[in-house]
């Protein structure tokens, strides 16, 4: 079963990312700061991306960083971050993914595995390499410290995530476990989304 990153726990806790305003803030800030992620969201959701205001939010964050802030940019940042931490539009879907995991946990009557992508999952180049972790969101730096999440969320390309899933289907290393895989996505160049032609 493939779920969402919100099903993963914050390191050192038993708090799911979906239930953490701190996670949502770090998630949307990381998304907006990446040109590749903004493009990926627009490709994946088409006109629905307009509801996200991701490009306007990206611009407002850039204005603040570059010392050219305006009251309008501040309003965009504050309203977007308030919506992200109080009532993110994606929360119902991610909560549903977490609920589906709960049907599997503790069930030994069938052979199952449940994989969640890391937070910064997007289209990108294929490297063929990845790392794995069970139950927790992968972070840069101290994996056991979830105090500050901003700038620490790891990711993976859609290609490498597919390789990790295929490898698990063959190797079965994560039987009856919830796991994730992450890889190299340091380039910030947009790649064609596999969702465009769906």
Name each region found by the language model:
Residues 1-2:
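Generic beta-sheet signal
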Residues 5-198:
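Oxidoreductase cofactor-interface core, primarily capturing Rossmann-like NAD(P)-dependent enzymes
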């Amino acid at each position: 079963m493939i779920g969402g990153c919100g099903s993963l726990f914050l390191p050192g806790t038993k708090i799911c990312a979906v239930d953490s305003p701190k996670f949502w803030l770090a998630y949307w800030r990381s998304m907006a700061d990446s040109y590749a992620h903004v493009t990926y969201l627009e490709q994946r959701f088409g006109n629905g991306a307009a509801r996200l205001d991701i490009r306007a939010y990206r611009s407002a964050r850039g204005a603040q960083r570059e010392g050219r802030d305006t009251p309008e940019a501040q309003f965009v940042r504050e309203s977007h971050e308030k919506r992200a931490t109080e009532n993110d539009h994606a929360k119902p879907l991610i909560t549903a993914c977490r609920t589906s995991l709960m049907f599997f946990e503790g069930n030994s009557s069938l052979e199952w595995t449940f994989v969640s992508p890391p937070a910064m999952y997007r289209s990108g180049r294929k490297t063929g390499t990845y790392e794995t972790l069970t139950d927790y969101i992968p972070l840069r730096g101290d994996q056991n410290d979830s105090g500050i999440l901003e700038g620490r969320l790891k990711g993976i390309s859609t290609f490498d995530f597919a390789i990790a899933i295929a490898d698990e289907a063959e190797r079965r290393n994560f039987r009856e476990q919830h796991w994730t895989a992450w890889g190299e996505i340091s380039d910030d160049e947009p790649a064609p989304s596999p969702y465009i032609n769906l």
